[in-house]
Amino acid sequence: MRTFIAIELEEEVKDHLAEAQAETQKLCRRGNFTPKENFHLTLHFLGEIAEDDIEYLQDAMYETARRNRPFTLTLDKVGFFPRGNKGIMWAGLERSTHLQRLFSTLEKSLEQQGFSRERKGLSPHITLGREVEPHRNFIDVQKNVRLEPMKISVRSIALMESVRKGPKLVYVPLFRMDLKGR
């Protein structure tokens, strides 16, 4: 099963992101845009895991949740990771020491359970589209699409599975851990 650990987003946040995504689509020729129901913030991509690994992941996530308390993030920008004339469109967040601490704790807990660290480190973003090709250029899109700042409540982390349902990719939560730290 193909998995990742993520922060799930509330419907209100997903609606807000979908509005920014729709504005961006008007300025683009084409792209593979993320369905609203799949918006999330990835903390650690695991890839293919065995069913037996779930118990170890639960232990790592429990330890992480025990050491971190709920916090708030702020969504505040739209950006691109360009790859030639196409790129990945994302929504970005203000820097957060709480998010960095959550990520660091998760990485240590996963490593103690025998999993590899995230090779790219933490680059907090919510993917809005892949293979996005703007009519003009990425800078033009960024100038013309405003993402009004919005607060995101982070109360839990979830182990998600990527499941193919026909032509669609669906992210299914396998379990969640509420943040309980002090």
Question: Where are the language model's segments positioned?
Answer:
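Histidine-dependent nucleotide/RNA phosphoesterase domain, centered on the 2H-phosphoesterase fold
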Residues: M1-R182
